Amino acid sequence: MSTDSVSIINIFLEIKGKARISCQLKRHLSPRTIGLITRSMPIHDNVHRMNKSVVYIKTNIDSGMERKKTDFKKGDIAYFPTGGCICFFLNDVLDGQPMTPIGKLL
């Protein structure tokens, strides 16, 4: 994890033996949630598929909804408070579950 600015935190999503993906957490999108996530790192879990457009990892992070959105673009990262999950969007999603936007896959 590296901080290149006050607002952007660069991290890597590592899939054991498969890939290492650069991500950016953007503090200005959801400062409270980003703070909880960064203090909880590293986060380890299996990747789960929610549907054809979303994969997620479960966390022990307990944060409520912050600046919720229901529309996400391919490459977005969001926190799903109902399940305590960090979600990664593989395709655009319109009118989905309300989630807290937290960053982007690079």
For the regions a protein language model found, what residue spans apply to each?
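Start-of-domain signal
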Residues: 1-44
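Glycine-rich active-site loops that engage anionic ligands at enzyme catalytic sites
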Residues: 27-36, 40-106
